[in-house]
Amino acid sequence: MPKIRHLAIVCMDPEALAKFHCEVFDMKVVERNGRQNVFVSDGYITVALLSQKAEGKPCGLNHFGFQVEDSAAIAERLKSWKVVGPAPRPPDRAYAELRATDPEGNNFDLAEGGFERSAARGGRKGAPATA
């Protein structure tokens, strides 16, 4: 059964927002990367706090990610919905293999290995293990 495993939020100050999530919700910082992004987790769901770099673009939800057992089966289900994707994610985005949109244009990722596979490949080292 697919499970939501991460959310990505575009924000003006990822460090300040990470501090908020850690102090208010007891989340833990699991990674910072060179793009000024901060990743926090409650041990199950990871929230990617992404630095806003595009002038005039809104902050808010960027995408959400599902961990799935069989991405090909999900891709087959998506065909009848006439949505964009799924398309392969760039190789430097090790935490998800595919990206698609829902019928209203909201982006979502599909990952068979999720953050656990990414940690094994050298990314998201502190992210929670998959369920």
Place the predicted regions along the sequence by residue.
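Short glycine-/small-residue motifs
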Residues: 110
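Core segments of cupin and vicinal oxygen chelate
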Residues: 2, 8-47, 53
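A short beta-turn/loop motif at secondary-structure boundaries
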Residues: 33, 55-56, 89-93
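Vicinal oxygen chelate
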Residues: 13-14, 64-107, 131
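Exposed loop/turn and edge beta-strand positions of beta-sandwich/beta-sheet ligand-binding modules
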Residues: 3, 34, 60, 94
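N-terminal beta-strand motif that seeds the catalytic metal site of vicinal oxygen chelate
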Residues: 1-16, 61-64, 114-131
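A short linear hydrophobic-aromatic micro-motif
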Residues: 28, 48, 83-87
